[in-house]
A protein has these predicted regions:
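A general structural signal for well-ordered alpha-helical segments in protein cores
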Residues: 27, 42, 46, 59-62, ...
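Active-site neighborhoods of divalent-metal-dependent phosphate/nucleic-acid chemistry enzymes
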Residues: 20, 70-115
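A secondary-structure boundary/capping signal
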Residues: 6-7, 45, 117
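Structured helix-beta-strand junction loops
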Residues: 35-37, 65-69, 92, 110, ...
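Generic structural signal for small/hydrophobic residues in well-ordered secondary structure
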Residues: 6-7, 49, 82, 107
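Short, well-structured N-terminal submotif of metal-dependent ribonuclease cores
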Residues: 1-41, 51-63, 138-140
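A generic structural signal for short hydrophobic patches within well-formed alpha-helices
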Residues: 10, 46-49, 121-122
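Acidic, PIN/NYN-like endoribonuclease modules and their adjacent C-terminal/linker elements
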Residues: 104, 108-140
């Protein structure tokens, strides 16, 4: 099964500074998913990852590396579902970003779990029917 990987996981993996033990486990899990060719990406996540890289050489290198990952084709239905999911959560007093709900819509339509470190998705889950990816124990 393909897994949608959210920006915070990618950001963690791309950071050079030291990481906590939990961070290291998340990076190790992402590495395994990449090795298994199970990562799927949406354009807005790709954009978030690439935004803010001022060095053109680093930008181009990362852009080329990210091209290895399947890009989910977004349709009108994805955007409409994202709006519907956002509205459903707002009625419950839960707010989130457009990208978060687009990720939820792609997850629901494609039956892809979401690998994220963002705790907001725990709140969305109760109202939008997404599955959150759980790290495997001892991912090698």
């Amino acid at each position: 099964m393909k897994v949608l990987v959210d920006t915070p996981v990618w950001s963690l993996a791309l950071r050079k500074q030291s990481k906590t033990e939990a961070d290291e486990r998340a990076v190790k899990e992402l590495t395994e998913l990449v090795r298994e060719s199970r990562v799927v990406m949406i354009g807005p996540i790709r954009q978030e990852i690439l935004s803010g890289i001022s060095d053109e050489g680093k930008f181009e290198t990362l852009r080329q590396k990210l091209r290895a990952f399947d890009g989910e084709v977004l349709t009108t239905e994805h955007f409409e579902l994202a709006a519907s999911l956002s509205n459903r959560c707002r009625r419950q007093g839960i707010q989130g970003s457009h990208t978060d709900f687009l990720l939820c819509a792609v997850s629901v339509k494609g039956n892809h779990p979401i690998f994220t470190l963002d705790k907001d998705f725990d709140r969305y889950r109760g109202y939008v029917g997404i599955e959150l990816y759980q790290e495997r124990n001892g991912a090698e």
